[in-house]
């Protein structure tokens, strides 16, 4: 997972914090961990970038981060992920910027304790790795910017390639930015158990959004995305798991940032709504407080609440009555109904000569009973995770 937090000079510009993160995929072996670290809103092929910058960067930078992730359920440690990543941005001219990222994930542990229809509760061992890279070129023109990106990710049984193009239009007073983007992804799934070989999945993504400076101290951003995919969505490692071969996703994200001159701090609020054709609806609420401190330090505590309904074809354990072979069915608890809280804190320090460092700690706790407006899916064990990410950066 990669993310950036950049400020673009003007007071209103520095209030926005744009995170582009890969969304979760419940058929990828790495997804039990990555689903917790992703926002499920970005187009594939878009690298971490200050999406509302209205001019080419005049300085380059390089960032190195290391993520340590672990999750568990009662009586069982599950997935461990160790993930170094590298991000860089270089201005090639006054109007052209290149940027890219590389990430390596080493994954080990056990799959979720889901209910296997043939043998009861199961937590099979998982060992995998993922390597991924992204590259993007952005050209700044008179009152607009055009970006082209490419992305590739490889696991032992999963290959993904994607590309995107985006178009941003700036108002004359530079207080408003319109954003439009289109992306496409081509995935191939070849599980080690041979259930399928080189099974395809193709996806098209569309984004439209606006960022508006409301005043010198406040800014709002709202994006909608729509995705349409066709291909293999079932989990080959779960017995009888059968999912539709088409999936569409609609998502709406709104962020609001308010600067307070007294404490020289920024309140960051966000809300995301997502609905997919599998029948699941999710809502995510997040609040963060960014507080600069003396001597180049800053701290940013945050709290996120996430809730989702179950997919139409999710069945609660034990093995459901009336099951018909060949019908859509899953016991994957990631498609169950639940709620989750994620408290986190980020600490950063700037040094001389363009150096900086940061550390983020987060804890995730998931329970069925925390579903908003419902009781959640019965028979699902509580799920917990924690991750620590440390980084160092140099601008030049």
Give residue spans per PLM region.
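Short sequence motifs at beta-strands and strand-loop junctions characteristic
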Residues: 56, 78-80, 125-129, 138-140, ...
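Transmembrane beta-strands of outer-membrane beta-barrel pores
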Residues: 66-72, 104-108, 141-143, 152-156, ...
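Outer-membrane beta-barrel translocator domains and adjoining extracellular loop/strand segments
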Residues: 73-79, 111-117, 151, 158-166, ...
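Hydrophobic, lipid-facing positions within transmembrane beta-strands of outer-membrane proteins
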Residues: 82-86, 131-135, 161-165, 202-208, ...
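Repeated loop/turn-to-beta-strand initiation elements of outer-membrane beta-barrel proteins
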Residues: 96-98, 143-148, 173-178, 216-222, ...
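Outer membrane beta-barrel transmembrane domains
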Residues: 117-123, 225-257, 273-283, 296-390
């Amino acid at each position: 997972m990669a993310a950036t937090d950049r400020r673009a000079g003007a007071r209103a510009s520095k209030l926005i914090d744009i995170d582009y993160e890969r969304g979760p995929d419940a058929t990828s072996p790495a997804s039990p961990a990555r689903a917790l670290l992703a926002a499920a809103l970005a187009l594939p092929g878009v690298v971490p970038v200050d999406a509302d910058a209205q001019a080419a960067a005049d300085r380059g930078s390089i960032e190195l981060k290391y993520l340590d992730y672990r999750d568990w359920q009662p009586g069982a440690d599950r997935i461990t992920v160790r993930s170094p990543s590298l991000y860089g941005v270089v201005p090639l001219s006054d109007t052209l910027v290149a940027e890219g990222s590389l990430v390596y994930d080493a994954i080990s542990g056990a799959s979720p304790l889901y209910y296997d229809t043939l043998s009861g509760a199961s937590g099979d061992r998982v060992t995998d790795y993922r390597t991924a890279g992204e590259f993007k070129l952005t050209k700044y023109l008179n009152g607009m910017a055009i970006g082209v990106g490419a992305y590739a990710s490889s696991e032992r049984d999963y290959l993904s390639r994607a590309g995107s193009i985006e178009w941003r239009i700036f108002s004359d007073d530079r207080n408003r930015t319109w954003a439009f983007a289109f992306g496409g992804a081509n995935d191939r799934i070849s599980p080690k158990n041979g259930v399928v070989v080189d099974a395809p999945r193709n996806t098209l993504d569309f984004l439209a959004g606006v960022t508006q400076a409301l005043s010198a101290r406040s800014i709002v951003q709202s994006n909608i995305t729509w995705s349409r995919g066709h291909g293999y969505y079932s989990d080959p490692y779960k017995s009888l798991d059968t999912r539709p071969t088409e999936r569409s996703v609609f998502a709406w994200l709104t962020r609001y940032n308010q600067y307070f001159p007294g404490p020289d701090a920024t309140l960051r609020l966000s809300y995301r709504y997502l609905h997919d054709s599998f029948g699941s609806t999710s809502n995510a609420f997040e609040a963060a407080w960014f507080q600069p401190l003396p001597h180049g330090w800053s701290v940013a505590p945050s709290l996120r609440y996430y809730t989702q309904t179950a997919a139409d074809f999710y069945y609660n354990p034990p093995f459901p009555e009336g099951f018909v072979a060949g019908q859509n069915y899953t016991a994957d608890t990631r498609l169950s109904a639940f709620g989750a809280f994620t408290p986190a804190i980020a600490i950063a320090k700037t040094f001389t000569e363009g150096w900086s460092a940061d550390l983020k700690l987060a804890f995730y706790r998931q329970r069925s009973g925390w579903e908003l407006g419902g009781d959640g899916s019965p028979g699902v064990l509580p799920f917990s995770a924690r991750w620590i990410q440390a980084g160092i950066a140099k601008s030049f």
